[in-house]
UniProtKB/Swiss-Prot annotation:
Polar residues bias (residue ranges): 646-656
Sequence similarity: Belongs to the anelloviridae capsid protein family.
The keyword Transmembrane helix is assigned to this record: no
InterPro entries: TTvirus_Unk
Name of the featured protein: Capsid protein
Chief localization: virion
GO cellular component, one term: T=1 icosahedral viral capsid
Biased composition annotated in UniProt, kind: Basic and acidic residues: 666-681
Localisation per UniProt entry: Virion
Leader peptide range in chain numbering: none
Job of this protein: Self-assembles to form an icosahedral capsid with a T=1 symmetry, about 30 nm in diameter, and consisting of 60 capsid proteins. The capsid encapsulates the genomic DNA. Capsid protein is involved in attachment and entry into the host cell.
Feature: compositional bias, Low complexity: 703-717
């Protein structure tokens, strides 16, 4: 009982020793304590006749010292109102085989049929995005911001709801700048986020049963954000936070149980396509030479795709022999199996030695299924189908190049389909094997080239979106969407091609004598003449322009991304990660008091209205101090002339409904270096060479050189004046923005430039074309 408690309180005496965790260095010398004299005893008689000692309290006197810190106060507006913005959104929706796509880029897509969304996302949240979600009936505001032009941001609470079967990994970022780089999407791969200490796992109900069905995360304001009153227009486009999320697989992190291997297989074009990869019309002669060589190589026809592409052309009677149409049987090799006679074929486009094959029709022993008469069929079929396409499409069709035709062109499934009659028979491609767990990333390169580029080498100017020294399974994650944002081309999947260089494949995708050489991969469906997903319904316009693009290479990136550790293997048709948010704001201002007077005689009932009262929400973009009435604008019952003139400048709303944005607002912006920005501006506004006026202190030789340089200029004076006027207008706009920023700094309404959207900081105002 009590004795046991007292026994537990006793401690054994030990010899003093220095503790290892104690500080051994000398501490700062403390201020000496003030010496006080002896307190005087005061005796006072208590009631009852007994004395008790009483002490007098002395007031401690000392030297007055200044405070180490002062408190800076900001006067708040007269009227303040707390507001919570509560809503529900899908952080990501991942359709079947869309793991490597960015859902934030595809969230507003309307493509159907086909899988929707993506397996990773880079979402950002701003006040404008919250208002846009309110207009879509995806959230509600607990207080109105009408006539309240000031605001304060207090943070947000996020609630992530766990999926029954699929795991997720998220990462919240509040550190500016909130921009995407070439490393952002690879860092969101589950194999990379699993190594990040700031990542949060959201396990499925199957992986971790018995716990709450949601995970709550409290997120504060962004870093370097000063908590004070701002106009709503200033915080309208300021990024509050970014959410990085991806689907993952915690039960089978190193490969799906539905497959028997972790090795990825895909095909790349052989080196014969190196000089004819461009689709420009001036390269047509080179493509024709290569197509004739490929069509003359009879072993390429040992595939079932020959029947699929050329037999309907023969059965329609398009090839005649005299007055009668030829049949498909006339192109079959009828030579019996024998080892007596052989023949040689020159492999097209390379320096390989001639290939020796038997003349028999047994393809398992290097025989040819078709005879030499089939050499002319691909080109004839390509020309006929091209003319038919031109007749159907009319003036909207401008391509007249049969070398890029679907049935018999350079990229026909006859040459590129991986399924041969005998597995050792080679096609116009190379089979590549890739083991993701042997990839160290050293020497890997992933980039895109425009379809007009005439070679497969990496060029610092012409090639774009280079990702190097990363594993292929990480570099392929969200790569197409990053290229679309980086180049500004939303149709880039039809205008560019993907190239890969990697020493960790079998065989190696590199040339030791040419370090910049890349290889063009393509998907299995493209090699078989099908659309992504396996559909045989190829549009007629695409059949006339059949060549590898990012549209046909997306499945290769998908296979590479799913091969990485902890990657989601797309075992379900569609999965989604739901999230609830509660943004905390305070609206403030000095509005004019609005008095509403109603006729009491028309009220026939005393009960309240059954319809719930709706809040009037104003677009934060136009809720600025200049467009709001304040108490100081109201004098003697009337508004002042300056206030009326200021309000007349308010833009009027229109009833014209747009078709929507090209890119969703929630998608993060991409980071552009200063060099890339200067290159883009130099393309839009070329540098102006002024006609130099020779000053009088220069000699005659300098005058002669100046006159010669002026004569060599190709631009006229009027063109130079137009360019100068255009640059002066741009300079005037940026100077006005600069003065506006300086005024905000003087009013203590400035925001850290790293928190502002791209183009809103002071540094971007000085990026004038040279």
């Amino acid at each position: 009982m009590a004795y046991g408690w007292w026994r537990r309180r006793r401690r054994r005496w030990r010899r003093w020793r220095r503790r290892p965790w104690r500080r051994r260095w000398r501490t700062r010398r403390r201020r000496p304590a003030r010496r006080r004299g002896r307190r005087r005893n005061v005796r006072r008689r208590r009631r009852g006749g007994r004395w008790r000692r009483r002490y007098r309290r002395w007031k401690r006197k000392g030297r007055r010292r200044k405070k180490a810190k002062i408190i800076i106060r900001q006067w708040q507006p007269n009227y303040r109102r707390r507001c919570n913005i509560v809503g529900y959104i899908p952080v990501l929706i991942c359709g079947e085989n869309t793991v490597s796509r960015n859902y934030a880029t595809h969230s507003d897509d309307t493509n159907y049929p086909g899988p929707f969304g993506g397996g990773m996302t880079t979402d950002k949240f701003t006040l404008r995005i919250l208002y846009d979600e309110y207009k879509r009936f995806m959230n509600y505001w607990t207080a109105s911001n009408e006539d309240l032009d000031l605001c304060r941001y207090l943070g947000v609470n996020l609630y992530f709801f766990r999926h029954p079967d699929v795991d997720f990994i998220i990462k919240i970022n509040t550190m500016p700048p909130f921009l995407d780089t070439e490393l952002t999407a690879p860092s969101i791969h589950p194999g990379m986020l699993a190594l990040d200490k700031r990542a949060r796992w959201i396990p499925s109900l199957k992986s971790r049963p018995g716990k709450k069905h949601y995970i709550k995360i409290r997120v504060g304001a962004p870093r370097m954000f000063t908590d004070k009153w701002y106009p709503q227009t200033d915080l309208c486009d300021m990024v509050l936070l970014t959410v990085y999320a991806t689907a993952a697989d915690m039960q089978y992190p190193f490969g799906s149980p539905l497959t028997d291997s972790v090795v990825v297989n895909f095909q790349v074009l052989q080196s014969m396509y190196d000089k004819t990869i461009s689709i420009l019309p001036d390269e047509k002669s080179q493509r024709e030479i290569l197509l004739n060589k490929i069509a003359s190589y009879i072993p390429f026809y040992n595939t079932t795709q020959t029947i699929a592409q050329l037999k309907p052309f023969i059965d329609a009677g398009n090839v005649t022999s005299g007055a009668t149409a030829t049949t498909w049987a006339s192109y079959i090799n009828t030579t019996k199996f024998t080892t007596a006679t052989t023949t040689t074929y020159a492999y097209p486009g390379t320096n390989r030695p001639p290939v020796t094959m038997l003349t028999c029709n047994d393809s398992w022993y290097r025989g040819t299924v078709y005879n030499t008469q089939i050499q002319q069929l691909p080109i004839k079929a390509a020309k006929l189908y091209l003319e038919a396409t031109k007749t159907l499409l009319g003036n909207t069709f401008t391509n007249e190049d049969y070398t890029l035709e679907y049935h018999g062109g350079l990229y026909s499934s006859i040459w590129l389909s991986p399924g041969r009659s005998y597995f050792e028979t080679t096609g116009a491609y190379t089979d590549i094997k890739y083991n993701p767990f042997t990839d160290r990333g050293e020497g890997n390169m992933l980039w895109i080239d425009w379809l007009s580029k005439k070679n497969m080498n990496y060029d610092k100017v012409q090639s774009k979106c280079l990702i190097s020294d990363l594993p292929l399974w990480a570099a392929a994650y969200g790569y197409v969407e990053f290229c679309a944002k980086s180049t500004g081309d939303q149709n880039i999947h039809m205008n560019a091609r993907l190239l890969i260089r990697s020493p960790f494949t079998d065989p190696q995708l590199l040339v030791h004598t040419d370090p910049t050489k890349g290889f063009v991969p393509y998907s299995l469906n493209f090699g078989n003449g099908k659309m992504p997903g396996g559909s045989s319904n190829v549009p007629i316009r695409m059949r006339a322009k059949w060549y590898p693009t990012l549209f046909h290479q997306q499945e290769v990136l998908e296979a590479l991304a799913q091969s990485g550790p902890f990657a989601y293997h797309s075992d379900i048709k569609k999965v989604s990660l739901g999230m609830k948010y509660r943004f905390k704001w305070i609206w403030g201002g000095n509005p004019v008091r609005q008095q509403v007077v109603r006729n009491p005689c028309k009220e026939t009932h005393s009960s309240g209205n059954r319809v719930p009262r709706s809040l009037q929400i104003v677009d934060p973009k136009y809720n600025s101090p200049e467009l709001t009435f304040h108490t100081w604008d109201f004098r003697r019952g009337l508004f002042g002339p300056k206030a009326i003139q200021r309000m007349q400048q308010q833009p009027t709303t229109t009833d014209i409904f747009s078709a929507g944005r090209k890119r969703p607002r929630r998608d993060t912006e991409v980071y552009h270096s200063s060099q890339e920005g200067e290159q883009k501006e130099s393309l839009l506004f070329p540098p102006v060479k002024l006609l130099r006026r020779v000053p009088p202190w220069e000699d005659s030789q300098q005058e002669e050189s100046g006159s010669q340089s002026s004569e060599e200029e190709t631009q006229t004076v009027s063109q130079q004046l137009k360019q100068q006027l255009q640059q002066q207008r741009i300079l005037g706009v940026k100077l006005r923005l600069l003065f506006n920023q300086v005024q905000k700094i003087q009013q203590n309404q400035d925001i850290n430039p790293t928190l502002l959207p791209r183009g809103g900081d002071l540094a971007s105002l000085f990026q004038i074309a040279p």
